[in-house]
Amino acid sequence: MINQIKTYLLMALLVGLIYAICMMLHIHPLIAIILALIPNVIAYYMSDKLVLMSYNARILEEHEMPWLHQMVERVARKAGLPKPKVAIVPTETPNAFATGRNPENAVVAVTEGILKLLSPEELEGVIGHEISHIKHRDILISTIVATLAGAIVMIAEWMLYWGGIFFVSEEEESNPLELIGTILLLILAPIAATIIQFAISRQREFYADEEGAKLTHPLWLANALAKLERGVELYPLERGNPATAHMFIINPFRKDFIAKLFSTHPPTEERIERLLEMCKRIGK
């Protein structure tokens, strides 16, 4: 229920943001409403397909990697969910993510790199983490946040390029305050997008770690996270949209100082410590 409320709030924020920008650009209110609603329709019905497409992910048929299908089905059954589709991402960056608007339309995507790096038990721990996201409907929030974050940056670029050029008549004098506002939006938009991801992602990852570990084994996931952290450092994702970073189990992009400051994920060391503490509590 809480995640559904968050989803509606995010969608309302996206509508309000785009509508306000359209008003600043002197677009007709009816057209502005249509433009504001389109991203939400896309976010709800197509964002999972767009995310998979952006990473050249391919849905695996049942006869392809049957052992992986069986693993996903086994963990999903423990969670009381239908088996999600399984996709493969052609990159050496070891990682995984889940997407889709609900458990009935979910996809678990794994990279070629993660299949090479992890043992079957460690991979099952990762699958448990992603299945937990699906069970608690984090995946719709993730895809909408990715759309919202991307939209914020895109709108800022629109305003810089179009503001005062296409939507201001020759008779109107340009307003220096609008120009200043446009420049400020361009500067602050990426920060705002990251803050939105930051607010949604960090606690969600801790919870998915714990719930996913209950479906499999906390030590399996702890070992997997340690390997993935090192693997991403060696093989960071060179191509991709940073607005989707929060969807992955580990941030797949190269981490400079600023990226670490505004990280969309909690520190991997802290996640591992929590899982090891969980091992002690349950005696595994």
UniProtKB/Swiss-Prot annotation:
The chain crosses the membrane at residues 7-26, 33-47, 148-168, 180-200. Its cofactor is Zn(2+). It comes from Methanocaldococcus jannaschii (strain ATCC 43067 / DSM 2661 / JAL-1 / JCM 10045 / NBRC 100440) (Methanococcus jannaschii). It is found in: Cell membrane. GO terms for molecular function: metalloendopeptidase activity; zinc ion binding. InterPro entries: HtpX_protease, Pept_M48_protease_HtpX, Peptidase_M48. Binds 1 zinc ion per subunit. Belongs to the peptidase M48B family. One of its GO terms (biological process) is proteolysis. It is a multi-pass membrane protein. Its EC number is 3.4.24.-. Zn(2+) binds at residues 129, 133, 205. It comes from the Archaea. CDD domains: M48B_HtpX_like. Keywords: Cell membrane, Hydrolase, Membrane, Metal-binding, Metalloprotease, Protease, Transmembrane, Transmembrane helix, Zinc. It is an enzyme of class 3 (hydrolase). The active site is at 130. This is Protease HtpX homolog. One of its GO terms (cellular component) is plasma membrane.
